[in-house]
């Protein structure tokens, strides 16, 4: 009877407890043959030692065993069980990517409805922090207001700018009918899923949620934002950014702006612009530090202390220049370059209306908000990976591997996390199912075929197949393209085109015949090669032509060769041949006519007559 790895380890531990020690040879004999990782073996030996069973290179003497303190006690069985469980976990390791993914996914606990709301609030808080920070960056608000002006000029759609507005005073769970269906039994869910699966490939992509923001409310909100923005700029211009009134105004515009639910494209654009400004600042500051520390040999500690004391002026540099310190002479040599960098920083401050310290503070708070939202989104995604797998299982054997289906489903899950609105009352899984299923079905339509077909054409093919099946049931026969065109209200030529596209490619390795000893590719003509019959006929014609030309004079033969391109790359005109022989065109025509008359003689033409049918 063959022992399992677990039973082998149990025997090993029992033997060790009985004799009080083990040798490395005994440990190796009881380990699985496929365990060759030195780290794993060392971990097992360490666990055996921790249980009070010493492991030796060779069997010790009886005296040495007596001197060794017996550390095993009543808890030895429990320790052995714990160690064995750890060892079994080690033995259960696999290199199969699906199993590894499942094991890692299983370590994350599922979320309750309350847990989802907590994480959704953290995501919202992170986004709020970013938007409130960006609101203090004057070009950002001006950019959004400019986008709204373009909407009013009918250059862009309102739905390209915002998706709606957030009411911070709304309840966490809106008392709406969206709860209906979230408590279905598992069997009812399975039935619904099976129905949806049959429709997924046939339906066009639908929009989730409301169709778009309310134009009247949007106009009112943007007008309010414009007024607050202009008032804030006026206060800052009159009293300075550090004035208490300016602080209140900045807080007010931040609170107002974070209620705007910006479209991801707009949100990313604002963050990117702020990042670009911060990058410009960093470039100049790094250049100043490089000049001072590396070229002028100013101690880095002194530079950091002086520069950070007042980042909006160059007074620190003038102070260091006036000092009698050893590096003052070096600073004097780089003074033009440092002042040039400071001038560029002044331009950035003028363009943004912000001091360098304020730009850094906004960027810092924005980064904190992004990190908070990113961590919360990661938690939400990891807690719902099981949902992706349960949906992906229903789409196997459709042209994509299971891991690919999981990956595509995970992309849909991440989209669902980005768009999830917990205030509507949906449980996240109810909302995410649509996005996961949509991502998977789209990927199957886009990637499953050997020859890629656009998604919109896949939808047309699915619709055509569905109607074709219906007509087959109604008429008892396959419908004609004309009948399909009439039923689908489409031109007949388009129906024929769709039918042609819908054909599945067949492998050239498909077995043919009862014995399956030949393949489909063996019966396909290779048009790139010349047929043996044509090759033999051409060679015979070439030999016959050379034979009859040999019966002419050298001049006549050459004229015919040039005129008809025999053994040459191309044929020649009378004028070209005349230049070759230094005679007139008429003379060449006469020579050609005479040579052809000779070839028409039965003694010569008989050789070529058999090639006329070829």
From Swiss-Prot:
Belongs to the sigma-70 factor family. RpoD/SigA subfamily. It is found in: Cytoplasm. The gene is rpoD. GO terms for molecular function: DNA binding; sigma factor activity. It comes from the Bacteria. Residues 574-593 bind DNA. Sigma factors are initiation factors that promote the attachment of RNA polymerase to specific initiation sites and are then released. This sigma factor is the primary sigma factor during exponential growth. This is RNA polymerase sigma factor RpoD.
């Amino acid at each position: 009877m063959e022992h399992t790895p677990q039973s082998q380890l149990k025997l090993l531990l029992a033997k060790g407890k009985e004799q009080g020690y083990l040798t490395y040879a005994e440990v190796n004999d009881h380990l699985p043959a496929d365990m060759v990782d030195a780290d794993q073996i060392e971990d097992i030996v360490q666990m055996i030692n921790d249980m009070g069973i010493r492991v030796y290179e060779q069997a010790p003497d009886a005296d040495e065993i007596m001197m060794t303190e017996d550390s095993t006690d009543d808890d030895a069985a429990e320790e052995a069980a714990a160690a064995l469980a750890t060892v079994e976990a080690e033995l259960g390791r696999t290199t199969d990517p699906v199993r590894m993914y499942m094991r890692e996914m299983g370590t994350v606990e599922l979320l309750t409805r309350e847990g989802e709301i907590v994480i959704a609030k953290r995501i919202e808080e992170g986004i709020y922090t970013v938007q409130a920070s960006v609101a203090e960056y004057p070009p950002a608000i001006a950019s959004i207001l400019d986008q709204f002006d373009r909407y009013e000029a009918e250059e862009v759609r309102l739905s390209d700018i915002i998706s709606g507005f957030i009411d911070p005073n709304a309840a966490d769970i809106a008392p709406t009918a969206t709860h209906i269906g979230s408590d279905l039994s598992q069997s009812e869910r399975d039935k619904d899923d099976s129905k949806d699966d049959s429709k997924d490939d046939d339906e066009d992509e639908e929009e989730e949620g409301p169709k778009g923001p309310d134009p009247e409310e949007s106009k009112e909100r943007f007008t309010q934002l414009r007024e607050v923005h202009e008032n804030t700029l006026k206060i800052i211009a009159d009293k300075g950014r550090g004035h208490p009134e300016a602080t209140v105004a900045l807080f007010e515009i931040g609170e107002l702006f974070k209620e705007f639910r910006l479209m991801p494209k707009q949100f990313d654009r604002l963050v990117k612009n702020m990042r670009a400004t911060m990058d410009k600042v960093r470039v100049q500051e790094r250049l100043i530090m490089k000049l001072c520390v590396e070229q002028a040999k100013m101690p880095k500690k002194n530079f950091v202390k002086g520069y950070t004391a007042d980042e909006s002026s160059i007074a620190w540099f003038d102070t260091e220049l006036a000092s009698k310190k050893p590096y003052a002479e070096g600073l004097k040599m780089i003074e033009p370059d440092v002042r040039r960098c400071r001038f560029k920083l002044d331009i950035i401050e003028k363009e943004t209306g912000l001091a360098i310290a304020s730009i850094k503070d906004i960027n810092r708070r924005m980064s904190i908000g992004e990190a908070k939202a990113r961590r919360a989104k990661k938690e939400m995604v990891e807690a719902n990976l099981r949902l992706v797998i349960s949906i992906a299982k229903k789409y196997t054997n459709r042209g994509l591997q299971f891991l690919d289906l999981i990956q595509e489903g995970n992309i849909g899950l991440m989209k669902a996390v980005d768009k999830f609105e917990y205030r509507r009352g949906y449980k996240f899984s109810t909302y995410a199912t649509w996005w996961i299923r949509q991502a998977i079905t789209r990927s199957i339509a886009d990637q499953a075929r050997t020859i890629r077909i656009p998604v919109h054409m896949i939808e047309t093919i699915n619709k055509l197949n569905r109607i074709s099946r219906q007509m087959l049931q109604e008429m008892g026969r396959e419908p004609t393209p004309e009948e399909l065109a009439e039923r689908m209200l489409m031109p007949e030529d388009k129906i024929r085109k769709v039918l042609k596209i819908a054909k599945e490619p067949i492998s050239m390795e498909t077995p043919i015949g009862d014995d399956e000893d030949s393949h489909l590719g063996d019966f396909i003509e290779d048009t790139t090669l010349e047929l043996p019959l044509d090759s033999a006929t051409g060679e015979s014609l070439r030999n016959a032509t050379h034979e009859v030309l040999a019966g002419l004079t050298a001049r006549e033969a050459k004229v015919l060769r040039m005129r008809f391109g025999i053994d040459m790359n191309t044929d020649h005109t009378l004028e070209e041949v005349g230049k070759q022989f230094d005679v007139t065109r008429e003379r060449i025509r006469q020579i050609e006519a005479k040579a052809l008359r000779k070839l028409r003689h039965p003694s010569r033409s008989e050789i070529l007559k058999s090639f006329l049918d070829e």
